[in-house]
UniProtKB/Swiss-Prot annotation:
Protein name (database record): Phospho-N-acetylmuramoyl-pentapeptide-transferase
Record lineage: Bacteria, Thermotogati, Thermotogota, Thermotogae, Thermotogales
Enzyme class: transferase
Membrane topology qualifier: Multi-pass membrane protein
Function (record text): Catalyzes the initial step of the lipid cycle reactions in the biosynthesis of the cell wall peptidoglycan: transfers peptidoglycan precursor phospho-MurNAc-pentapeptide from UDP-MurNAc-pentapeptide onto the lipid carrier undecaprenyl phosphate, yielding undecaprenyl-pyrophosphoryl-MurNAc-pentapeptide, known as lipid I.
EC number, as in UniProt: 2.7.8.13
Keywords: Cell cycle, Cell division, Cell inner membrane, Cell membrane, Cell shape, Cell wall biogenesis/degradation, Magnesium, Membrane, Metal-binding, Peptidoglycan synthesis, Transferase, Transmembrane, Transmembrane helix
Gene name tied to this protein: mraY
MF (Gene Ontology): metal ion binding; phospho-N-acetylmuramoyl-pentapeptide-transferase activity; UDP-N-acetylmuramoyl-L-alanyl-D-glutamyl-meso-2,6-diaminopimelyl-D-alanyl-D-alanine:undecaprenyl-phosphate transferase activity
Keyword check for NADP: no
Catalytic activity, reaction form: UDP-N-acetyl-alpha-D-muramoyl-L-alanyl-gamma-D-glutamyl-meso-2,6-diaminopimeloyl-D-alanyl-D-alanine + di-trans,octa-cis-undecaprenyl phosphate = di-trans,octa-cis-undecaprenyl diphospho-N-acetyl-alpha-D-muramoyl-L-alanyl-D-glutamyl-meso-2,6-diaminopimeloyl-D-alanyl-D-alanine + UMP
Pathway listed: Cell wall biogenesis; peptidoglycan biosynthesis
Family: Belongs to the glycosyltransferase 4 family. MraY subfamily.
Amino acid sequence: MDIYSAATLLAEFVLGIIIFPKFIDYMKKLKLGQYIRQEGPDLHNYKEGTPTAGGIVFISLTVIAGLILKLPKELIFTLLFYGFIGFLDDFVSIVKKRSLGLRAWQKLALQFLFSIWIAYTILQYRTSSIFGITVPSWLFYLFTMLLVSGYSNATNLTDGIDGLAGWVFVTSMIPFMFFSKSSMEYKAIFVIIMPLLSFLVYNTRPAKVFMGDTGSLALGAYISTYALMTNNELSLLFFTPIFLLETISVILQVSSYKLRGKRLFKMAPIHHHFELLGWKEEKIVGVFSAWNLAIAIFYIAFFLNR
């Protein structure tokens, strides 16, 4: 990576450190804060009113740096569009003064619509394949719709306690370095990590700002699109075990309650289960991030020693 690119990435972090306090103060003046869902843990009640939609800042910094570094348009537009969906969700939540924003079907419809464009764009320069197996193009479109939208929502589910979604994303994105084939791929990894790290300075417990759906939906879409672009769909599964665990815990919880009338966990997603067991938020973030990275390292070690 050249000095120019490194300086651009460093500037993202520094600007984030400078901008976030101003963003937080501005949101407080407008009284635009997070509403806590009623079915969530009572431990979170004190967080109500905390400025949200912090994703606006790190997405903006990433897009500007991405344009400077001439990153692929798929990544830039993915951040913008999924960030926009999340912003609409946050906006509705704030205006209507409730924890839920857009309806689930509305978010999914918008996510599916844009993922079709992602699949079309990617197929202009790579073969229609899934996990290295050639498939009909319609199946690749379907796979892209499910993967990108699925990861977008998985990251959103993980964003339930201070710092969790951000640190899990960082520990999921960094391992892709080991399979990067060009400087552009390295840049695509760090162009999102650097401003996100500046966000995490203010999102660590007690959080002064939340990323909101603006940030979480965009992050999940970004990492899955990056994996598709670089033919790393299989690696994605091993680099994001916590995102998968959070999603699976919700599916199991809902299925168990519908079929058996019993809950498997004290609360889902599973990070809330550990909260109600008495784990502090810092411990959950540390343990989840460590396991996320450890599983990725084991996969890399296995792959490199085949």
